[in-house]
Amino acid sequence: MKAIVKFAFQLGAKIALNPDFIVEKGGRYFLLNNALLKFARKNFYYAGAYLGKVKNGKFFPSFNLLAMLAKGEANKIVVEKKAAWLFICGRDIFRRGILAVRGSRKKGDHVLVLNEFGDCLGFGRIVRGLDEGAKNEVAVKNILDVGDFLRREK
């Protein structure tokens, strides 16, 4: 549970999850409801909403968790259509592709990346202050995007 809260903090978000509904199994975290909690005490592979996993001491969020964080207050950027497509293809975001910034603009901070419709596409790290630099310079380094799953398929 600490890993989830720490990750949310890195994005400038606060997340209020009832620890009674969070189940950890093999380093993977799941958010369950009352009905599922009865069954989850037994052996299970997947239940409820998958929130992410801890591997080698590092937390890897799920897109369920990113979508939850995107609904509230957090560091976010909204990108135009072409930048959104390039981002889900694994590319970084140039300043010229950013339409709006909410929250931190500081170098080194993490941001959620949203398309023009408010869909969370993933997250990245600000590599150059969002108020500085040329429009043709990388502003946000891609860390995780929704296209990752498809790129891993063989």
Regions found by a protein language model. Give the residues of each.
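Accessory RNA 3′-end/elbow-binding domains used by RNA modification enzymes
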Residues: 1-154
